[in-house]
Amino acid sequence: MATPANQTGRITQVIGAVVDVQFEGHLPAILNAIETKNGDNRLVLEVAQHLGESTVRTIAMDTTEGLVRGQEVTDTGSPIMVPVGIGTLGRIMNVIGEPVDEQGPVANEGLRPIHAEAPLYTDQSTEAEILVTGIKVVDLLAPYAKGGKIGLFGGAGVGKTVLIQELINNVAKAHGGYSVFAGVGERTREGNDLYHEFIESGVNKKGGGEGSKCALVYGQMNEPPGARARVALSGLTVAEHFRDQGQDVLFFVDNIFRFTQAGSEVSALLGRIPSAVGYQPTLATDMGALQERITTTHKGSITSVQAIYVPADDLTDPAPATSFAHLDATTVLNRAISEKGIYPAVDPLDSTSRMLSPLIVGEEHYQTARMVQQVLQKYKSLQDIIAILGMDELSEEDKLAVARARKIERFLSQPFFVAEIFTGSPGKFVDLADTIKGFRAICEGKYDHLPEAAFYMVGAIEEAVEKGKKLAAEAA
C-alpha cells in the first residue's frame, strides 16, 4: 500500500540489522522502503513492525555501521522497487536493484515492487504441461512441469552449476525464454565464477544487453540477513515481468535454504519467539508467499529450479521439509555417478516427478520410463553378487539385464553445449520423442549387439549406432 512519500523521520535505535525510526506525522506502511544516507551510500530499510509512539522497526538491506541516532530518514511511499525488462539480462543487481557489476546503470522498462500478491486462481493456467529441457535423463525420468517447482539436490562439485547453465541455454534456444538467477546467501566467489562462466559459455554477453539470456540478482553470504531474506523476491519480480510479457521463464534460486535461514535471523532480531529447531514462527507463511508467486498464468510461465541444502543431511529439518511441500519434481545429483564420468550425474532412481503419470506424459513415455527404472533397479540389486562372485555366476537372463543397464547408464549421459569448451564434443539437444524411442529400443534389446562404449556421451540413439559402427571399424 502506498503512503504519502517524502515523510521524514529520525533514527532512535540501531541494533545490528534492525533500525528503529520515529516519524512525526504519517507512519510508513508495513513493507515500505525508507531511505537514508550511510556515508556516500544509499541505505534502504524495510518497515517490519509498528511499535507505537510513532516508531517503526525496520530491517536494513545493507550494513548499519556508521548510522547514528537522530539521523534523518525519508519514506519512499512504496515497497523496494527493482528495475525489470530486457536491460536486466546479463547484469548483476543487488537486492534493491542497483548494478554491482561495474557496467554502468541498468537500462530498464520501469520499476516493480518486490512485494506482490500471487496471481489469482482465475488467472492461473491449470493445464499440466511438460517443459522439454533437451536433457535425456530429466525429460524421460523426472520431467519438469511448465510453471512447476523443481528441487535440485547435490553436494559440492557434482555438477549443479553446469546443469543450471545447460537448462538456461536450452530454454533460451528451444522456447526463446529468458532466465533469472537469484543467488541467495551463497559464496561470493561462486557468484563471481558463475558470472564469468556464463560469459565464457555464451549464456550472457559482457555488459549485458542483446544476446544475453539470464539476469543475475545476488545477495551473498556476507550480506546482512535483510538482503538475504529479500533477494529471492527481487529476482522473482524480474522473472514475473518477463512472464507477464508472454515468456516461459526459468527462475533459479541458489540456495532456498539460505532464504529460510535469513528469515530466521531477521525473526530473532525482531524479537519473535522462535518455533521448532529455532526457526521463525512464520516459516510456512514466508515460504508460501514466495512459492505461490512462482506459477503459470494465461500469459506465460515461471518454472523454478531451486538448489536445496539439507542441513546435516536431515530431510525432516523444518527448512527443507517446508520446501518439499511446494515441489513438483526433484533432480538428485549423485557423486557415485559423477565418479563414473557420467554427466549429467542425475540419479535415475532417486529423482522423481509428479508429471510422470500416464495421464500427463502419455502411456508410451510412462511405460518406457518405468522399464528403464526396472532394469536399473535390477542391476543395482545384482551389484553385490557381481562384486563378490563376478559376472560369470549370473544367469543368462541377469547377464542380459546387466548389459542393458550399463548401456542405459551410459546413454543417460550426454554432451552439454555449455561444457563444449571443456569436453571438445559439441552439445546435443535431444527431442522428447527421440529420447523415448532410444531408451525403449535399448530395453527391448534392439541394440544388444552394440558395445556399451557406443552409448557414452551421445545425443539421440542414431548417434550411438554410428559410434558403434566406427568402433567396430577401428577394432577390425
From Swiss-Prot:
A single GO molecular function, which one?
ATP binding
* InterPro entries cross-referenced by the UniProt entry: AAA+_ATPase, ATP-synt_VA_C, ATP_synth_F1_bsu, ATPase_a/bsu_AS, ATPase_alpha/beta_chains, ATPase_F1/V1/A1_a/bsu_N, ATPase_F1/V1/A1_a/bsu_N_sf, ATPase_F1/V1/A1_a/bsu_nucl-bd
**Which of this chain's residues are annotated to bind ATP?**
G154, G155, A156, G157, V158, G159, K160, T161
Q: What is its EC number?
A: 7.1.2.2
**SMART domains according to UniProt:** AAA
Enumerate the Gene3D superfamilies for this protein.
Answer: 2.40.10.170, Bovine Mitochondrial F1-atpase, Atp Synthase Beta Chain, Chain D, domain 3, P-loop containing nucleotide triphosphate hydrolases
Its recorded reaction(s) are: ATP + H2O + 4 H(+)(in) = ADP + phosphate + 5 H(+)(out)
Chain's role: Produces ATP from ADP in the presence of a proton gradient across the membrane. The catalytic sites are hosted primarily by the beta subunits.
Q: Where in the cell is it found?
A: Cell inner membrane
Q: Which HAMAP family match?
A: ATP_synth_beta_bact (MF_01347)
For this UniProt entry, what's an example GO CC term? plasma membrane
Q: Which NCBIfam families match?
A: atpD
Species name for this entry?
Rhodopseudomonas palustris (strain BisB5)
Q: What class of enzyme is it?
A: translocase
Belongs to which family?
Answer: Belongs to the ATPase alpha/beta chains family.
Question: Assembly state and interactors?
Answer: F-type ATPases have 2 components, CF(1) - the catalytic core - and CF(0) - the membrane proton channel. CF(1) has five subunits: alpha(3), beta(3), gamma(1), delta(1), epsilon(1). CF(0) has four main subunits: a(1), b(1), b'(1) and c(9-12).
Top-level taxon of the source organism = Bacteria
User: How does the record say this protein sits in the membrane?
Assistant: Peripheral membrane protein
Key words of the record: ATP synthesis, ATP-binding, Cell inner membrane, Cell membrane, CF(1), Hydrogen ion transport, Ion transport, Membrane, Nucleotide-binding, Translocase, Transport
UniProt lists the gene as atpD
Q: What is this protein called?
A: ATP synthase subunit beta
